[in-house]
Swiss-Prot record:
GO terms for molecular function: ATP binding; formate-tetrahydrofolate ligase activity; methenyltetrahydrofolate cyclohydrolase activity; methylenetetrahydrofolate dehydrogenase (NADP+) activity. In the N-terminal section; belongs to the tetrahydrofolate dehydrogenase/cyclohydrolase family. In the C-terminal section; belongs to the formate--tetrahydrofolate ligase family. ATP binds at T405, P406, F407, G408, E409, G410, K411, S412. Its EC number is 1.5.1.5, 3.5.4.9, 6.3.4.3. This is C-1-tetrahydrofolate synthase, mitochondrial. Substrate binds at Y84, V85, R86, M87, K88, V131, Q132, L133, P299, G300, G301, V302, G303. Pathway: One-carbon metabolism; tetrahydrofolate interconversion. Residues 341-972 are annotated as: Formyltetrahydrofolate synthetase. PROSITE patterns: FTHFS_1, THF_DHG_CYH_2. The keyword RNA-binding does not apply. It comes from Schizosaccharomyces pombe (strain 972 / ATCC 24843). SUPFAM superfamilies: Aminoacid dehydrogenase-like, N-terminal domain, NAD(P)-binding Rossmann-fold domains, P-loop containing nucleoside triphosphate hydrolases. GO terms for biological process: 10-formyltetrahydrofolate biosynthetic process; folic acid biosynthetic process; tetrahydrofolate interconversion.
Length: 972
């Protein structure tokens, strides 16, 4: 049977309307002598379509984002195809389905058409895709229709859906519309097919084959007849049920039928009768209706049912998409716990990660929003946020710690363990962490992927190149510095006329401002009340002002960067070659994560924001004290291009297969020491709730702030939250028994020496004394009106009495709870009690009470003072003359309202690393002030901060190697 049958059947429903009935067609009479029950598809179809319309209306009332949509692809302008498309459009709109018409010229070639279909497959706003047949002969219809993804194959003709239909123990996503309509029509008329001898006339993939599968599934005994079938009449005469779908007008005669049989006529044929065209079926209705017990008319039988089933399929497709989008469930990867706990790299290598595409699907991320980098890591497109921005954010948890010690308190381990524990409790937990620099990985610190059974994997990818974001930051930063140095060189070696000729070239008789310099040109023109379009009439003085930056070399703020610990780049000279004509300058390298470009990556809210921030970077002052920006240099567009992929968060996973966004890695000393705003925003929407969800359906986003509450957490709130407008529900403050003993007066640790016994045996006095440090950090959290849960990172050398001392001190200081957590040895199961306490704190929190330490309008000096007094417990701040001079410059340049990012030691609440526990009676000296205008903060220097570390005598790289099978060993 020709594939056009299905579209002809679609038409039948509409032929009942006089407004759509072609005048050239006549219709056969059903006759008055019929004894058969008429299976009226028109009435049932209307009932079903009303039901579909009511369901759509109800779902839209519950979820304003529920918008089922059908797209029809039409190639060429055949008039009959135009009629069918209009019919489907009308039917769709009647039940509340959006309609998208996609016409293409008859000349379109196969690759282009398949590309357009792929775009529809990838479009999450489209739920059903139909290709209007027939197609021009140069297009392969099967290839085209099979290219439609199964969830959107609402015709149900694709191999995937037909294949599942043919299997006894499987169910297709969508049933073919006409066969499905036949079964519904029989069911509505209380005709059970179980045990019947059913004969199907025709074996097309549109009706014959699929209806045979449906009948068989409903326990009929099915015979499929076709043009080669012998004794066809004999088969028909033995049939209890006849499905006629062979495309031959009035082929089946009444005398062939078994008395009392049921006849379903799928055919639609135009024949000449008395000089007029008449529509008839494949069954001779007049004779058949006298023998059959029930029969479908033509038109008004199967045709309207096809349309109704198509509408049902489209709505079902939209419901499936909605369910996949709303309901997220993470399947945990089981751990094989061992004692003693093996090395981190052994554990990481022994666990097979999930395919990242599968994890993304569990979270509700579409394939089209994922850019895979191999099997276990991927970038997530920022379009996810736009798609989900209507959601209420999930719960937001920030992990901080007490003052760090050489032991390491394990904040990253807590983050991993906590989200794994959320998974055990049936909650979606998403970690958001920084990408570690390769410098420390090969230096003294080692990796930063967590530890034990609470890690981020693959560990080697996490600690090394990942997706190349840090390399992109390195390239962008170094392009900026190279552009600045080169511009200085050219200004020193060329005349005004030569600079004007090269920077404002004449094309077709008109001077052209380069795209990257349009902003600078517009500002200069505005300051001179000149029309920026009138470039040709600009004065030589104005053109000179435009092309000459007049950089003061002594004020250059940006250094070249490298993601390697290399102490010998701390002070260098550039421009020593003879080709640079004496343009020699002392400078230095920083580590890549100390670059302002990295801070911008972390603090940008979207691509446009990143572009603006890169443009606002102040790279030097001119000789008159005015700020020179990357925008003045014309390089901000190129920097954005280099970072266009880096701005997309990286998706990885924990050992137990819970999701982790790993994105950005700004230096914690001179920057915010936190992962990106973008990662947090996307994660909060993925963990968020729809308007109809219950509050308890919300998931949890767990992120980390570098170092302790006085450093990373203070910057997290006063800088990151200020720009993101996001407010955490709870702080998790990490502490350990060993760290508190050190703060409580325990002996200092000496490099290479054994750990003193005090840290390995119970010592209640040291723990009690050290709790003062923890209490101060709890108080710091409360200054922002955020509840605190203390996580006691457990070790086998701890005693229950030591834990109880910590718990009592934490509760007395106002913590919601203090919970020992053994995630390092037990994975998520070891952190379940901690997770429960965090959930309780989130339920009880009201982040509307959140407050910042200072307003933007507060003076720079007062901002620094309030941080020192409130966070560190200092008596005050003492500014050097250089720092005061810098402050005046920043105010003059318009940067006085920026927040403060203090640069000091992490090893003390004070500026002095030797001052342990909770220092008293000290003043913080500020020797210098620096500006990161693009990132959006000023950083006072309260200590000498090395911005490029060196390598120790025995660096971590000594133990790192790769095996013949490609497995990396020695990472920690």
């Amino acid at each position: 049977m020709n594939v056009m049958v299905s579209f002809n059947q679609l038409r039948n429903y509409f032929l009942e309307s006089n407004s759509l009935r072609p005048s050239k067609w006549l219709f056969q009479s059903y006759g008055t002598s019929s004894s058969a029950n008429i299976l009226n598809g028109k009435l049932l179809a209307r009932k079903l379509q009303r039901s579909v319309a009511e369901e759509v209306q109800a779902l839209k009332a519950k979820d304003r984002n529920f918008k089922p949509a059908l797209a029809i692809v039409q190639v060429g302008k055949r008039e009959d195809s135009n009629v069918y498309v209009r019919m489907k459009e009308k039917a769709a709109r009647l039940v509340g389905i959006d309609f998208k018409y996609c016409p293409f010229p008859e000349t379109i070639q196969m690759p282009a058409l398949l590309h357009e279909l792929k775009k529809l497959n990838d479009d999450h706003t489209v739920h059903g895709v139909l290709v209007q047949l027939p197609l021009p002969k140069h297009l392969n219809e099967r290839t085209v229709t099979e290219s439609i993804t199964p969830p959107k194959d609402v015709d149900g003709f694709g191999a995937f859906n037909i294949g599942l239909l043919a299997k006894n123990d499987a169910t297709p996503i969508h049933y073919p519309c006409t066969p499905k309509g036949i079964m519904e029509l029989l069911k509505d008329n209380k005709i059970s097919v179980a045990g019947l001898n059913a004969v199907v006339l025709g074996r097309s993939d549109i009706v014959g084959n699929p209806i045979s599968y449906l009948l068989r599934k409903d326990n009929a005994t099915v015979t499929v007849c076709h043009s080669k079938t012998k004794d066809l009449i004999q088969h028909i005469s033995n049939a209890d049920l006849v499905i006629a779908a062979l495309g031959k007008p009035e082929f089946v005669r009444g005398e062939w039928l078994k008395p009392g049989s049921v006849v379903v006529d799928v055919g639609i044929n135009a024949v000449q009768r008395n000089g007029k065209r008449v529509l008839v079926g494949d069954v001779h209705f007049e004779s058949a209706s006298k023998v059959a017990s029930s029969i479908t008319p033509v038109p008004g039988g199967v045709g309207p049912m096809t349309v109704a089933m198509l509408m049902e399929n489209i709505v079902n497709a939209a419901k499936i998409a909605r369910t996949e989008n709303i309901y997220r469930k993470i399947d945990l990867n089981p751990l094989e716990l061992k004692k003693p706990v093996p090395s981190d790299i052994e554990i990481a290598n022994s666990q097979e990660p999930k395919l990242i595409s599968n994890l993304a699907k569990e979270m509700g991320i579409y394939d089209t929003e994922l850019e895979n980098y191999g099997n276990y890591k991927a970038k997530v497109n920022l379009a996810v946020y736009e798609r989900l921005k209507h959601r209420k954010d999930g719960n937001y948890v920030v992990v901080s710690g007490i003052t760090p010690t050489p032991f390491g308190e394990g904040k990253s381990t807590v983050v991993a363990g906590l989200v794994q524990a959320m998974g055990h409790l049936g909650k979606l937990g998403i970690a958001c962490v920084r990408q570690p620099s390769q410098g420390p990985t090969f230096g003294v610190k080692g990796g930063a992927a967590g530890g034990g059974y609470a890690q981020f994997i693959p560990m080697d990818d996490f600690n090394l190149h990942m997706t190349g974001d840090i390399h992109a930051v390195t390239a962008a930063n170094n392009l900026l510095v190279a552009a600045l140095e080169t511009r200085m060189f050219h200004e020193n070696t060329q005349s005004d006329a030569a600079l004007i000729k090269r920077l404002i070239p004449v094309k077709n008789g008109r001077r052209v401002i380069p795209r990257g310099l349009i902003g600078r040109w517009n500002r200069i023109c505005a300051s001179h009340n000149m029309d920026p379009e009138d470039v040709n009439n600009a004065s030589p003085e104005l053109l000179k002002e435009f092309v000459r930056l007049n950089v003061d070399p002594d004020t250059i703020e940006c250094n070249r960067v490298l993601d390697v610990n290399d102490r010998f780049l701390r002070s260098i000279e550039v421009g020593k070659a003879s080709t640079e004509k004496g343009h020699v300058r002392k400078t230095s390298f920083d580590i890549s994560v100390a670059s302002e470009c990295m801070s911008i990556l972390a603090l940008s809210c979207d691509l446009n924001d990143m572009h603006s921030r890169l443009s606002r970077m102040v790279i030097a002052n001119d000789k008159y004290g005015n700020a020179i920006t990357a925008g003045d240099l014309g390089v901000s567009g190129a920097l954005t291009v280099l970072l266009k992929d880096a701005i997309k968060p990286n998706l990885m996973q924990t050992l137990e297969g819970t999701p982790a966004f790993v994105h950005a890695g700004p230096f914690a000393n001179i920057s915010i020491g936190a992962s990106s705003i973008i990662a947090d925003k996307i994660a909060l929407k993925l963990a968020g709730t729809e308007s109809f969800d219950r509050p308890e359906d919300a998931g949890y986003v767990v992120t980390e702030a570098g170092f302790a509450s006085d450093m990373g957490m203070e910057k997290f709130f006063n800088i990151k939250c200020r720009y993101s407008k996001l407010v955490p529900n709870t702080v998790v403050l990490v502490t350990t028994v060993k760290a508190l003993k050190l703060h409580g007066g325990g002996p200092k640790l000496k490099p290479g020496a054994p750990i003193p016994e005090e840290y390995l045996v119970e010592n209640l006095d040291l723990v009690k004394n050290g709790c003062s440090n923890m209490v101060k950090h709890i108080q710091n959290c409360h200054k922002f009106n955020i509840p605190v849960v203390v996580a006691i990172n457990s070790y086998k050398t701890d005693s229950s009495k030591e834990h109880e001392i910590i718990r009592e001190a934490a509760l007395q200081a106002g913590a919601v709870d203090a919970v020992p957590s053994d995630h390092w040895a037990q994975g998520g199961k070891g952190a379940i009690e901690l997770a429960k306490s965090v959930m309780t704190a989130c339920d009880q929190s009201s982040n509307s009470k959140f407050r910042l330490l200072y307003d933007s309008e507060t003076s720079i000096e007062d901002k620094v003072n309030v941080i020192a007094k409130e966070m560190y417990g200092a008596n005050g701040v003492e500014f050097s003359s250089l720092a005061k001079e810098r402050i005046n410059t920043f105010i003059k340049q318009g940067f006085g309202n920026l927040p403060i990012c203090m640069a000091k030691t992490q090893y003390s609440l004070s500026h002095n690393p030797e001052f342990r526990n909770v220092p008293k009676n000290f003043t913080v000296p500020i020797r210098d002030m620096r500006l990161n205008a693009g990132a959006g903060f000023i950083y006072p220097l309260a200590a000498e901060i090395q911005t490029i570390p060196g390598l120790p005598t025995a660096p971590a790289y000594l133990n790192i190697d790769i095996c013949e099978n490609g497995e990396i060993v020695g990472l920690s």
